[in-house]
């Protein structure tokens, strides 16, 4: 029938337009809105990017001091970014407590957003106010075939993991286990129009049998296997991006040059570098 013929001729762009029908700006628009910073060579742009799911702890405090000092020593910029996409765990007065702590210890950022006031030219500095930006970048990934809708249910994913564990295989959504990776555009469009819930996954091109070297400013050269996990970059319930995706877009557009964070994040480097083609890598 006519509907089937129309769906059969659909492209990745049609799929992207179906998922994001109301975006008014493109990736190119945002690249122009956030130009390179006018700083001297060697100036460090650093950030403190807490989630308002708790109060500042010693780890936060230590990384804040390092980021603050590094930016001041190089005549750079230190900014505060509120990563508030985990609304279910958000604590009402967390942002106020963070700002009070920064002010008390003379660690106030050069750029920030607080109580409706934006200080700086690279805001908004609150992630929940940047959703359309993330959507524009996810839409572009879908258009070029580097992201796709995944319709796997929680039960399906639990069964997958259980099966992998029983067979002592590496767990995750990758390769032949990435059930929705190669479904046709036509099928994806039909299932979305039928109201089937979905997330958006990044389509990785990594090979875990291959290695790459990452240059860490503290630990030096570190070798990792490439990432082949098709990681979720947009959730299904509220169309919010995941942390892994949102912070990369932000660091790119805000022109962050150095990231100081805990060692527990080292294992995420392969994933972040596989996503980094949307931006330029920052230094860690």
Regions found by a protein language model. Name each.
Residues 2:
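Active-site loops and adjacent core secondary-structure elements that bind or stabilize anionic groups
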């Amino acid at each position: 029938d006519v509907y089937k013929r129309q769906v059969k001729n659909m492209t990745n762009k049609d799929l992207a337009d179906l998922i994001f029908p109301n975006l008014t700006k493109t990736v190119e628009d945002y690249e122009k809105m956030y130009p390179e910073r006018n700083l001297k060579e060697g100036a460090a742009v650093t950030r403190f990017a807490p989630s308002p799911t708790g109060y500042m702890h010693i780890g936060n405090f230590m990384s804040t001091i390092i980021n603050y000092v590094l930016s001041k020593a190089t005549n750079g910029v230190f900014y505060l970014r509120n990563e508030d996409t985990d609304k279910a765990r958000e604590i009402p007065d967390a942002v106020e407590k963070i700002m009070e702590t920064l002010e008390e210890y003379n660690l106030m950022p050069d750029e920030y957003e607080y109580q409706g006031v934006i200080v700086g030219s690279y805001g908004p500095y609150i992630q929940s106010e940047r959703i359309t930006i993330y959507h524009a970048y996810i839409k572009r990934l879908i258009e070029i075939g580097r992201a796709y809708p995944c319709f796997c249910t929680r039960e399906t994913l639990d069964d997958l993991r259980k099966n992998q564990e029983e067979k002592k295989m590496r767990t995750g959504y990758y390769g032949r286990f990435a059930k929705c990776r190669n479904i046709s555009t036509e099928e994806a469009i039909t299932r979305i129009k039928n109201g089937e819930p979905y997330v958006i996954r990044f389509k990785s091109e990594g090979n875990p049998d291959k290695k790459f070297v990452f240059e860490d400013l503290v630990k030096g050269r570190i070798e990792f296997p490439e990432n082949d996990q098709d990681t979720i970059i947009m959730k299904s319930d509220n169309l919010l991006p995941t942390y892994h995706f949102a912070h990369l877009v932000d660091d790119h557009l805000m022109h962050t040059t150095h990231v100081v964070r805990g060692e527990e994040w080292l294992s995420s480097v392969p994933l972040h570098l596989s996503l980094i083609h949307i931006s330029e890598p920052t230094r860690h």
